[in-house]
Amino acid sequence: MRDIVIIGHKAKTSGDFSLNDLPGSAGRMDILCRCVSSALFLSFGMRRDVNVHLLLLGEPEPGKIIRFEGLHLRYLNPDERSSGSLIQKALQKTVTEKDIRSTPGVWVRNGDLNTLLASFEGRTLFYLREDGEDIRGLDREIRDPVFILGDHMGVTEEEEKQLLEAGAKIISVGPISLHSNHCITLLHNELDRAEAERGEIPGGEKLRAGE
Amino acid sequence: MRDIVIIGHKAKTSGDFSLNDLPGSAGRMDILCRCVSSALFLSFGMRRDVNVHLLLLGEPEPGKIIRFEGLHLRYLNPDERSSGSLIQKALQKTVTEKDIRSTPGVWVRNGDLNTLLASFEGRTLFYLREDGEDIRGLDREIRDPVFILGDHMGVTEEEEKQLLEAGAKIISVGPISLHSNHCITLLHNELDRAEAERGEIPGGEKLRAGE
């Protein structure tokens, strides 16, 4: 399983935004939409072994978590508006601390970074930062990872502190600073290559076959 | 310089589509929009050393080429709707075989794959196909490349014939078939790493500094 967390510092936490203006009205929700698409799509299908966790910290109710589960996901197309629409539907739900299913494979609840980190106890955490250790030296060791990425604002000092306390390792994907969705594509590629080398089938094909 | 060609087999060739429905009304223009964004954006700025060539083959006037020049580009944001809007503006121009500037850094003309290939004479062409040679064995040799990618329909037999006749080398970016925009991110990363190893500054920073 690959879990990917993206922190949206300004991303709206109510569904009253316009799908025609995801960058403006929805607090740079376009960034999160592109991350969802990069995390989940293969050329002909979905990555079944991936969960995406969007941590939304914008107004009016900072601290909501939307989870996309590749294994159960439906109604998602690769365009930004499609993931934006599923996010909007999830934000129209009345949420509590407990998971509520919005659409197939999409879940929403209240929570913050600590909530998420607690749910990953025992997993290996990797926090993406441009000066981190190059993933190319590590990719053969990485199993069952959780990756944590910031948005256009990066990761705050407070968040970084929480990540390091939780044992996250700092990694990078190349020599220059890239958008989060591009980083996700690069992470997947490293792991796909490592899985293929081990004779496994990348992208969770086995899971799909067993559905 | 890195030139990237994406063939949009169904992409509309008039500007009368809705930015609210890039996949449907504009003939999977969403794919081309994501490619533009992946090709041109760095975390804090634009890749100045990249040109993107969209070959639009959909109705009503199949055979238009829109070129985005990283060095001169303005008004582009990373969201799909932003590149969709610049494409739409270009398609609203009356075009001929000669380049017409639509907005800063965006040019449009009539043409087909052969027109494009002729304009790259002397350059090294790389055609992306999932069973191609792995770029990781080649990346240190690649200078001044032109990459050619298909859309959701891939590349037709006829196009492939033209590409091979023009001397294109078939390469791949990993063990599984990916969306074109993800392939572009992976191509850039390989070249960025090779440039960094050679002590160059990836992303065309030198060009930017000299503007």
Curated annotation (Swiss-Prot), chains A, B:
It comes from Methanosarcina acetivorans (strain ATCC 35395 / DSM 2834 / JCM 12185 / C2A). This is tRNA (pseudouridine(54)-N(1))-methyltransferase. GO terms for molecular function: S-adenosylmethionine-dependent methyltransferase activity; tRNA methyltransferase activity. One of its GO terms (cellular component) is cytoplasm. It catalyses: pseudouridine(54) in tRNA + S-adenosyl-L-methionine = N(1)-methylpseudouridine(54) in tRNA + S-adenosyl-L-homocysteine + H(+). It is an enzyme of class 2 (transferase). GO terms for biological process: tRNA methylation. Homodimer. Keywords: Cytoplasm, Methyltransferase, S-adenosyl-L-methionine, Transferase, tRNA processing. S-adenosyl-L-methionine binds at residues 128, 150, 183. Belongs to the methyltransferase superfamily. TrmY family. Its main location: cytoplasm. It is found in: Cytoplasm. It comes from the Archaea. Specifically catalyzes the N1-methylation of pseudouridine at position 54 (Psi54) in tRNAs.
